[in-house]
Each structure stands twice: as C-alpha cells, then as structure tokens.
Amino acid sequence: MSTKKIILKSSDGHSFEVEEEAACQCQTIAHMSEDDCTDNGIPLPEVTGKILEMVIEYCNKHHVDAANPCSDEDLKKWDKEFMEKYQSTIFDLIMAANYLNIKSLLDLACQTVADMIKDNTVEHTRKFFNIENDYTHEEEEAVRRENQWGFE
C-alpha cells in the first residue's frame, strides 16, 4: 500500500516530497491537509530549503508507526545527536518549528538552548546571543545591587 505524499516548497524555491503522515506532525501542514489544500504543494515562505530539510529529517524520525518503530531511549539519543549536528542553525530551527507549529521540535530546540546557557555568566550569555550591553557601568552596578540574590 502506497503512502500519500505531499510537496513542501521552501522560501528559496526548493521542493521536497514528504509522506503526508510525517509532514502532518507540523500542525500548520496538518490543518492544510485537513482542508485539502495540498494538491499543488504547500508554500512555506518563512522556511529556507536548508532548514526545511532538517525539519523533514526530524519529522521522518519522529513519525513512529509499525513500519518505523523506535524506542523512547533511541529517540532521545537521536534527538541529542540531531541537536548537536545542527547546533549552528538552532535558532533557525526554533523559528521554523514555531512557524510550522511542531511543539516537540520547538520544545527540544528551546531546551537545548537553555542547557547551553545555564550556569554561564551574563557576559557569556550576551556573547552567545550576540547581545550588546547598552548599560553604563553605573547602571549595571545598580541592577546588580538591586538583584543581588540573582548573582549569588
């Protein structure tokens, strides 16, 4: 028995043929599928081909059924390796997971970022997120005094 396929079109013109059941982990796509709006492909103007390929890889792995069994332990190991593999594009993955409404990928990517910055200094976190410190030295000291408990 053949599985229905749908075409996903990235913002930069790449097209990907994906099993509908795997793609429907994206709630955005699932709603379009329910409304029979998939015949001509689904344009995804907020997701590049590079990132869409990663999202599809994630969805294919997480589409577990009789033909594609996977234990929770194996899936957790795969998720960890997936995040390590795509660490340099993690913020793009977060944006795509949010846009496509893939809660499990969004949660995984956000937790990965949280784990990456926990126990780091403010300066390291600023550098990690490329945030410029716009406080004067005096303002920064005042904030530290007012919130001393947070720096202990």
Swiss-Prot record:
InterPro entries given in the database record: SKP1, SKP1-like, SKP1-like_dim_sf, SKP1/BTB/POZ_sf, Skp1_comp_dimer, Skp1_comp_POZ
Presence of the UniProt keyword Transport in the record: no
SUPFAM superfamilies with a match to the protein in the record: POZ domain, Skp1 dimerisation domain-like
Domain of life: Eukaryota
Annotated keywords: Nucleus, Ubl conjugation pathway
Keyword Ion transport applies: no
Protein name: SKP1-like protein 10
Species of origin: Arabidopsis thaliana
